[in-house]
């Protein structure tokens, strides 16, 4: 299949989107054109960031992703669509995919996944509430897409967020100033993580390896660690003193999750995802980094060093 040369990004200024956009621009010599499709309000609200990217060679296309004419007009000059839209507009991708399938020059599409594997467990995954919109997107692709090559980049949780000082310690937290942590599960339950910087790096690697990533759900990561291993590294990097530690057991986490959904708590999704991770829903016998020549990734020590610095 032909190499990716012209990329259009949707959702490229969001939580993970900004890392993806930055990584693609850092490898711009590998591509002919990189553009960001965004709204007029984003152009106004994120002017400084967009100006910086424009100096790095990013083209800005202003439009409304809910308007077919805007999207079709934008698609005209590109061969690859990278979607990084947020959870609140995941379902809007179905229309982006439908229009891409109908646009002959578009040959590749990366839906917004970059997180927990929504098809990890055939028995339980279909029923997890946070997965529903992404599952609808995958269902549409399986049933309706015939021409496009589709690649899902499944990264597991973002290390940067999991390792942070949460405003709700019950679902896990690491506070470097107070030297206090709340660990999930037994402390010995391994979780596969990807730093947000590596999400961008791995996405670029997939873009550069079209044959290897063609029509695959790539299971990639930066590192795997248990909460106790994470704690030990935090203690090492903060002077060697033992931290105060509490635990939220898997049973307690499940109980808190149930209560959060019943009360309409916005944090319910976080409880569900962290329960899935603690149960082992990020673990594989083999990761796919080697398929796309992306074995060099951030380590646990590097990820924690960033957190320690950010909390200083």
Swiss-Prot record:
Q: Give, as in the UniProt entry, the pathway in which the protein acts.
A: Secondary metabolite biosynthesis; terpenoid biosynthesis
Please tell me where NADP(+) binds in this chain: 11-17, 47, 138
Q: Where are the transmembrane segments?
A: 7-26
Glycan-carrying positions = 105
Q: Name one GO cellular component term.
A: membrane
**Is Transmembrane tagged as a keyword?**
yes
Q: Which PANTHER family match?
A: ISOFLAVONE REDUCTASE FAMILY PROTEIN (AFU_ORTHOLOGUE AFUA_1G12510) (PTHR47706:SF11), NMRA-LIKE FAMILY PROTEIN (PTHR47706)
The principal localisation class reads membrane
* Native source species: Hormonema carpetanum
Compartments, record wording: Membrane
According to the UniProt record, what class of enzyme is this? oxidoreductase
Q: What does this chain do?
A: Reductase; part of the gene cluster that mediates the biosynthesis of enfumafungin, a glycosylated fernene-type triterpenoid with potent antifungal activity, mediated by its interaction with beta-1,3-glucan synthase and the fungal cell wall. The pathway begins with the terpene cyclase-glycosyl transferase fusion protein that most likely uses 2,3-oxidosqualene as substrate and catalyzes glycosylation immediately after cyclization. The fernene glycoside then could be processed by the desaturase efuI which catalyzes isomerization of a double bond established by efuA to form the core structure.
**What's in the keyword line of the UniProt record?**
Glycoprotein, Membrane, NADP, Oxidoreductase, Transmembrane, Transmembrane helix
Q: Is Glycoprotein among this UniProt entry's keywords?
A: yes
Question: Record's family?
Answer: Belongs to the NmrA-type oxidoreductase family.
Q: Which residues form the active site?
A: 134
Please name the GO terms of the biological process aspect recorded for this protein, alphabetically: terpenoid biosynthetic process
Which InterPro entries is this protein grouped with? NAD(P)-bd_dom_sf, NmrA-like, NmrA/Isoflavone_reductase-like, PCBER-like
User: Could you tell me the membrane topology recorded for this protein?
Assistant: Single-pass membrane protein
Q: What EC number(s) does this enzyme carry?
A: 1.-.-.-
GO molecular function terms listed in the Swiss-Prot or TrEMBL record: oxidoreductase activity
> What is the protein name for this chain?
Reductase efuL
